[in-house]
């Protein structure tokens, strides 16, 4: 958990790399959660925009990262102590520009226009979080497995 003036914040997961740097993961469990919403407003020229579920997940990740950066040393110590106590892992933790990972929804049935707008949205928020659908995640894992099986 991350202690803040708003109370305790609890990301779904925190990934720790081999150097002790952390990233925050937010998983939306509903496979039916939409990543896109159709905008009918003239101002958006009928483009697809981030869905409400995706917008909420992005905001959650941004707040986790904000609070981690604000509480840097305190959070590093807290995570380090938790790792040592619960997992018997003793390694330094570093909060240095953490990134987010958001997993939600499906993308295998998006049409070409939706796929294009989804890609724009993913790239637009790349500096904050890697946005993945469950289909994206499965595709990445399949490619990774195939790579190692063919070696």
Question: Where are each of the predicted segments found?
Answer:
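Charged, terminal alpha-helix-loop-beta segments
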Residues: 1-151
């Amino acid at each position: 958990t991350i202690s803040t003036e708003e109370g305790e914040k609890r990301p779904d997961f925190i990934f720790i790399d081999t150097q002790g740097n952390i990233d925050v993961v937010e998983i939306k469990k509903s496979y039916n959660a939409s990543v896109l919403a159709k905008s009918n407003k003239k101002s958006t020229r009928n483009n697809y925009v981030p869905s409400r579920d995706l917008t909420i997940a992005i905001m959650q990740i941004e707040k986790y990262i904000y609070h981690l950066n604000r509480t840097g040393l305190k959070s590093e110590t807290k995570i380090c102590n938790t790792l040592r106590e619960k997992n018997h892992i003793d390694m330094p933790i570093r909060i240095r520009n953490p990134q987010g990972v958001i997993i939600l929804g499906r993308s295998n049935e998006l049409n070409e226009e939706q796929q294009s707008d989804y890609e724009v949205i993913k790239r637009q928020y790349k500096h904050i979080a890697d946005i993945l659908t469950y289909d994206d995640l499965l595709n990445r894992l399949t490619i990774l497995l195939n790579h190692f099986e063919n070696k």
